[in-house]
Amino acid sequence: MNDITAAASVIAAALAVGLAAIGPGIGQGNAASKAAEGIARQPEAEGKIRGTLLLSLAFMESLTIYGLLVSIVLLFANPFRG
């Protein structure tokens, strides 16, 4: 593998994980904040809010996992290898 291609693949893998974690991280923080706010306003709806929160957090976390999978492909099964 060309040295430049190898270096670019490592940088791309790091960026894939880093950038894939920024959006969901901010979204998870906002969702947890609003869920806590909603539970404080309506304690009787706690179960419904918590269930919805956990489902949405799982969907947000899947985006980070996709970034991790892209970085693993770039590091170990690099399609740009000659």
Curated annotation (Swiss-Prot):
GO terms for cellular component: plasma membrane; proton-transporting ATP synthase complex; proton-transporting two-sector ATPase complex, proton-transporting domain. GO terms for molecular function: lipid binding; proton-transporting ATP synthase activity, rotational mechanism. The keyword Cell membrane applies. It comes from the Bacteria. NCBIfam families: ATP_synt_c, PRK07354.1. GO terms for biological process: proton motive force-driven ATP synthesis. Pfam families: ATP-synt_C. Keywords: ATP synthesis, Cell inner membrane, Cell membrane, CF(0), Hydrogen ion transport, Ion transport, Lipid-binding, Membrane, Transmembrane, Transmembrane helix, Transport. InterPro entries: ATP_synth_csu_bac/chlpt, ATP_synth_F0_csu, ATP_synth_F0_csu_DDCD_BS, ATP_synth_F0_csu_sf, ATPase_proteolipid_c-like_dom, F/V-ATP_Csub_sf. Belongs to the ATPase C chain family. Signal peptide: none annotated. The record marks 61 as: Reversibly protonated during proton transport. The chain crosses the membrane at residues 6-26, 57-77. This is ATP synthase subunit c. It is a multi-pass membrane protein. F(1)F(0) ATP synthase produces ATP from ADP in the presence of a proton or sodium gradient. F-type ATPases consist of two structural domains, F(1) containing the extramembraneous catalytic core and F(0) containing the membrane proton channel, linked together by a central stalk and a peripheral stalk. During catalysis, ATP synthesis in the catalytic domain of F(1) is coupled via a rotary mechanism of the central stalk subunits to proton translocation. It comes from Gloeobacter violaceus (strain ATCC 29082 / PCC 7421). The gene is atpE. The keyword Translocase does not apply.
